[in-house]
Amino acid sequence: RVIPLIIADEKLREAERIAGDTPILSLHPYVRKTAGVITTGSEVASGRIQDTFTPILQKKLAAYGIEMTEHRTVGDGLDAVASATAELRTKKLDMILCTGGMSVDPDDNTPGAIKQSGAHIVTYGAPVLPGAMFLLGYFDDGQPIMGLPGCVMYAKATIFDLILPRVTANVPVTKRDI
């Protein structure tokens, strides 16, 4: 890190030596993508409460040129969420996003359903607030799936907002990255 306006040449050379052949900066363009969203929760599926998450999520996606082309609303059951995931997998979407059911309550089955659907889980949990209950996984074909905690709806910037640009630029995200 260079604080002053000038730096000694030997310090700059040392930084170059440490970096080696690794580029200091690489740019990956955003790629237009499609997303499928699965809204989980019996209270939303039954119509008892209005889905206020999806409209906010659509705005966040649109900022990166991502179009939500599929949307399913299902109850809290493990099989219902896994079935909706399997259905969206047939739609050849660029990513699948699940909202609801991400905390530690007994009826929060979204993480288990994502795992049951065949995704390889990169992480369930992130050392970032807000967003500690974030889930990221990939299917064998490279399609990402994310479980989004409720904070994505309320907070301007969460772990999702840090990961989404990388996913949009086709940069794989590893557990080490998170």
Over which residues does each language-model region extend?
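Short glycine/threonine-rich loop/turn motifs
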Residues: 42, 48, 52, 66-178
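Short, glycine/charged-enriched hinge/interface segments at domain edges or termini
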Residues: 1-69
